[in-house]
Amino acid sequence: MKGSILKEKYSWIWLVVLMTILNLLFYWKFIIGKEFFLVSKDMAIQQYSSLVNWLNHIGDGIKGWSFSEGMGNSYDFSGQTFSLNIFLLLFGKENLKYTFIWYHLIKMYLAAVLFYCALTKLGIKQKVAVYGALCYVYSATFIVRSFWASYALEFVLFALLLYALECYFQDNNWLLLVVAIVLLGTQLQLYHLVVYSVAMLCYTLIRNYLVTNYRGKKFWKYIGNCALIMIVSVIILAYRLIPEIMSTFSSGRVANVST
């Protein structure tokens, strides 16, 4: 009995071990540097070139501005806000192309562990949660979409949001939910925040009304608290959302202006 409890308690270690074995099998050529994990053109042309551009100009001392061209020129580094991008830059421009596989693997482990935590928080047995987490990160959707760096990040943030929602519902821990929403707003685009906000609302309605059987004032209290958390998160994100909204509505596609 004691041994089985220990196995159940530390089943997340088996998740990490199994993932490590599978990753060595699937990504060995990328890990040893024989091939570069720049599979899609978007990753090779957009993200890689953007990071190289940042490395070329980051030493000028003013963020978003470089004096390397004439009297100076602005550079948009707003898309490099995720902290793991800083991890990529630490290895320099010459080694940058070798780091993308590690960037991908870190996101895989984060997504798997967070999804595992979310499943166990829902009351699912830990061994079953291990299988669920493996299916989550080795699904066809994750593998295909991982060729674009931002898409794989969605899996991490979705798992974090699900875990944060359950922490709020079960432990009344609202801080983690605010962190999850803020990360969604800063690391992804505006429409991601809208889509996941609607999904969060639907999840809240279904969970509180059908699963916990909350009715009346208690039901609306939870809905109101979730709305308040969303408002606080949006206020924190105002510095990013307001310029993005203005840019969206002033674009030719939205304003119906032909270019």
Regions found by a protein language model. Name each.
Residues M1-W28, K221-M230:
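Start-transfer (signal-anchor) and selected internal transmembrane alpha helices
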Residues D60, C167-D171, K217, K221:
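Membrane-interface extramembranous regions at the lipid-water interface
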Residues E94, Y214-R215, F219:
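Juxtamembrane loop-helix boundary motifs flanking transmembrane segments in multi-pass membrane proteins
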Residues K7-W14, G92-T99, Y103, I124-G132:
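Membrane-interface starts of transmembrane alpha-helices
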Residues T20-A112, L134-F155, T259:
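Membrane-interface coil-to-helix junctions
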Residues M19, Y109-L122, Q126-L210, N225-I245, ...:
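Membrane-embedded helix bundles of polyisoprenyl
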Residues F249-T259:
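Membrane-proximal helix-loop-helix interfaces that form the catalytic/acceptor-binding platform
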